[in-house]
Curated annotation (Swiss-Prot):
Localization annotation: Plastid, Chloroplast
One GO location term (cellular component): small ribosomal subunit
GO biological process: translation
Protein's name according to its UniProt entry: Small ribosomal subunit protein uS14c
Organism from which the protein derives: Sorghum bicolor (Sorghum)
UniProt keyword annotations, A-Z: Chloroplast, Plastid, Ribonucleoprotein, Ribosomal protein, RNA-binding, rRNA-binding
NCBIfam families assigned: PRK08881.1
Disordered: region residues: 26-56
Length: 103
């Protein structure tokens, strides 16, 4: 089980990312625009605007966690579970459609 403080920190990052998502996306779109290219000074202003946003609002700062244990490693996207919890649940027949492989 992960520490509660780490799980709360991750939730806080997720909220910040959602809050600043549109601002971040629109400013990046303006910087990269080929249709109406910006001058160098305008690009630097947009870059400064991006840098002024909180660090934890960047999507790369997020980490996918197991929703039962909070474990940050070995997560399966399809189930939202870490590997060892997924294995235990499959063996206990708690996940429909998932079976042990045998050949």
């Amino acid at each position: 089980m992960a520490k509660k403080s780490l799980i709360q920190r991750e939730k806080k990052r997720h909220k910040l990312e959602q809050k600043y998502h549109l601002i971040r996306r629109s400013s990046k779109k303006k910087i990269r625009s080929k249709v109406s290219p910006l001058s160098l000074s305008e690009k630097t202003k947009m870059q400064e605007k991006l840098q002024s946003l909180p660090r934890n609002s960047a999507p790369t700062r997020l980490h996918r966690r197991c929703f039962l244990t909070g474990r940050p490693r070995a997560n399966y996207r399809d189930f939202g579970l870490s590997g060892h919890i997924l294995r235990e649940m499959v063996y206990a027949c708690l996940l429909p459609g998932a079976t042990r492989s045998s050949w």
